[in-house]
Amino acid sequence: MTVLKMTDLDLQGKRVLIREDLNVPIKDGVVSSDARILASLPTIRLALEKGAAVMVCSHLGRPTEGEFSAENSLKPVAEYLSKALGRDVPLVADYLDGVDVKAGDIVLFENVRFNKGEKKNADELAQKYAALCDVFVMDAFGTAHRAEGSTHGVAKYAKVAAAGPLLAAELEALGKALGAPAQPMAAIVAGSKVSTKLDVLNSLSAICDQLIVGGGIANTFLAAAGHKVGKSLYEPDLLDTARAIAAKVSVPLPTDVVVAKEFAESATATVKLIADVADDDMILDIGPQTAAHFAELLKSSGTILWNGPVGVFEFDQFGEGTKTLAKAIAESKAFSIAGGGDTLAAIDKYGVADQISYISTGGGAFLEFVEGKVLPAVEMLEQRARA
């Protein structure tokens, strides 16, 4: 994968537009989870150190396109960046016809989704973005799977289009995990539905030695193997699909589980052998016996890809399975890569971030890359590099 990299460019005195993924949760006008902003800071700082006039853009939430919405404003992000960088980061609302920014200074553009044509990747809008800069830097891996004005269109029309350090690191880490993984390889794929992760499961079944499933996905595999899952979430129409995947790769199934009679923070957790699951039970986590077995599989792996917690870890009584696996990944000598929104929240909760080789900031983009799909924004950077 050959792309031009921002780190190789002379940015002194250049107007540089950086597309970051600053789509962070905001609560009461304040950033409530800063992981994506923290991930973007090294790129922004590097551009400033290189003497560029820096313009940063991002989306936030899903506003009605072309309309301002206070709840989707990047104002709290501008305030956060000002504190983090120790300098004023003005939020610029009207920028499409030009913006005044000096070398060594930085501005943040208001939410790109307030611009008509952003999501449809309109040429006219993309050309306006491109006219603002000498160099466009795509650094938002989390939106690289979307062909939009500020991710794909601008890369097509900018004088120079390059990958930022964060995007380049994501591509390198994923390439290492999927292209030539150290053996044996284990993957954890968890979520509510097999249907939403079917392509991921099929793709990983071709390269994994152990495919550990969790959540509603595991319930479907358990039901496919003839086990009772009570009133747990599962997909009865995908039992044959689960069996077909299990025929291609080792899918170790839980031997014990944590169940409850209701899905609630106050629910009482009970550990049961899988054979003892009652008709009115909901499976909300893997049991300690299963967690210990899965942990051993992970500790002996050469590569680990982790997407999704294996239980309802938001409720502590159903979080022990995810906690045990998180600690096992942290203690493993394997090259480990983790991605997907809930996965990042679990990593935060159990304090293992520093012991995971690479944490992907992309949710949908991470999954599409794992599926083997082409990411439009990356493909455009490759085309520009070839040209």
Swiss-Prot record:
Record's catalysed reaction(s):
(2R)-3-phosphoglycerate + ATP = (2R)-3-phospho-glyceroyl phosphate + ADP
Q: Where does substrate bind?
A: D21, L22, N23, R36, H59, L60, G61, R62, R113, R146
Listed A to Z, the keywords are: ATP-binding, Cytoplasm, Glycolysis, Kinase, Nucleotide-binding, Transferase
Picking any one GO molecular function of the record gives: phosphoglycerate kinase activity
Tell me where the transmembrane regions lie.
none
Q: Which GO terms describe its cellular component?
A: cytosol
GO BP annotation list: gluconeogenesis; glycolytic process
Pathway membership:
Carbohydrate degradation; glycolysis; pyruvate from D-glyceraldehyde 3-phosphate: step 2/5
Q: How does it assemble?
A: Monomer.
Name it. Answer: Phosphoglycerate kinase
Name of the gene encoding the protein in the UniProt record:
pgk
